[in-house]
Amino acid sequence: MEPLRVLELYSGVGGMHHALRESCIPAQVVAAIDVNTVANEVYKYNFPHTQLLAKTIEGITLEEFDRLSFDMILMSPPCQPFTRIGRQGDMTDSRTNSFLHILDILPRLQKLPKYILLENVKGFEVSSTRDLLIQTIENCGFQYQEFLLSPTSLGIPNSRLRYFLIAKLQSEPLPFQAPGQVLMEFPKIESVHPQKYAMDVENKIQEKNVEPNISFDGSIQCSGKDAILFKLETAEEIHRKNQQDSDLSVKMLKDFLEDDTDVNQYLLPPKSLLRYALLLDIVQPTCRRSVCFTKGYGSYIEGTGSVLQTAEDVQVENIYKSLTNLSQEEQITKLLILKLRYFTPKEIANLLGFPPEFGFPEKITVKQRYRLLGNSLNVHVVAKLIKILYE
C-alpha cells in the first residue's frame, strides 16, 4: 500500500511529524512549512531528509499546493488571535491571514486531501475563524469532529487543554461523530456509553490579578473555599491539586525527569523567589500534575509553568508559614531551602511526548528552547487522534 502523502503546515519543531511516526500509519511527510528560522533549525536537525520550506504560507500558490499532491494535512495555525490572554483579534488579527489563505485554497485544489487534523488553543472553538473552517470543510464534503483534550487523559502529568479538529473526506458520518458538540475525551468507538460533551461547561480558572512583592503578614482574610491558606491559593485550588496528585491513572513527574541534570543553572534566582514566591506553582517529583508550560517559561514566572522542588523531606507549607515577620534576607534564606528549579527543556519535551532521540542543535539557547516548546503540542495526544482519524 502506498504511504499517505502528508503536508505539515506551521511545522515548528516537528511535533506533528513525531506524532505521525508514533501513530505508525503508513505515511510520509512530503513537505513541512514554517517561517520561523529558529524552529526550522530544530526541525532540520531532527528530520534532515524531509523537504522543509522556509516561507510564508500566504506565499504558496494554488499550483504549488497542487504539485505536492497530499492526502493529509496536519496543521497548528498561530494561536495568539484566539488566546484567553491575548486580544482575541480572531479574523482581524494579521496572524490569521495564512490560515485564511489555506481555507481559500482548499476547495480549489485539483485533489482534495482525504484527512485533516488541526490543533489550536481553547478559545478557537468559539471564534469566527473556526466557523469559516467548518463551513469550508462541510462544503468540500468532509465529516468532522471537534475535541478539547488534555494530556492528563493519557496519563501524562501535564495540563495542556487544546482544541483539535479531525476531518475525513467521506459521505457517511464518523462512528463517534457528535454534531455540534465538542468532545472532552477520546472517542471509545466500541463503547455504547455516551461521550462527555463540552456543552456550556466553562472550566474557567479565575485569573488572579496579584501584585508581586506581597507581604507575608497573612493579612488576607477570606472564608470557606475561597480562603487563602498559604501562598495565593484557595482551599478549593489546593483540593483540586490534591485530587490530581491522587489520580493513580496518571504517572509521576519523576518518570519524565533527567537523571544527570546540572541543576544549578536551572535554580530560581533569589530575586525571583522573593518577588514571586506566592505565585509559584510548586511540584515535587512524586506529583502527578504540572501546569501548562508556555513560551515565556524560564524568562517569566507567573502563569508560565510549574517549578520543581528538589529538596526532599521539606514541606512547602512549613517554609511558607515561617516567612511571616522575617526580613527579606531571611525570607530568601528560607525559600532557598526548597531548592526550586525550572524544568529543563528536555524534561518539558518528555512531558510533551517527544521521543528520547528528539534534540536541539547546540547553538539553540535554553531560552529559545523554552520558547519553541511552549509553542509546540503534545505528541501523544496528536498521535492518538491520527490513529482514530485513519481508522
Swiss-Prot record:
EC number: 2.1.1.204
Main location: cytoplasm
Pfam families recorded: DNA_methylase (PF00145)
PROSITE patterns: C5_MTASE_2, SAM_MT_C5
Enzyme class of the recorded protein, top EC level: transferase
Keywords for the protein's UniProt record, in alphabetical order: Cytoplasm, Methyltransferase, RNA-binding, S-adenosyl-L-methionine, Transferase, tRNA processing
SUPFAM superfamilies per record: S-adenosyl-L-methionine-dependent methyltransferases (SSF53335)
Tissue distribution of the protein: Ubiquitous. Higher expression in testis, ovary and thymus and at much lower levels in spleen, prostate, colon, small intestine, and peripheral blood leukocytes.
Start and end residues of each SAM-dependent MTase C5-type domain: 4-391
Catalytic activity: cytidine(38) in tRNA + S-adenosyl-L-methionine = 5-methylcytidine(38) in tRNA + S-adenosyl-L-homocysteine + H(+)
Residue positions binding S-adenosyl-L-methionine: V13, G14, G15, D34, I57, E58, S76, S376
GO molecular function: RNA binding; tRNA (cytidine-5-)-methyltransferase activity; tRNA methyltransferase activity
S-S pairs: none
One annotated Gene Ontology cellular component of this protein: nucleus
Function recorded in the entry: Specifically methylates cytosine 38 in the anticodon loop of tRNA(Asp). Has higher activity on tRNA(Asp) modified with queuosine at position 34.
Protein known as: tRNA (cytosine(38)-C(5))-methyltransferase
Originating species: Homo sapiens (Human)
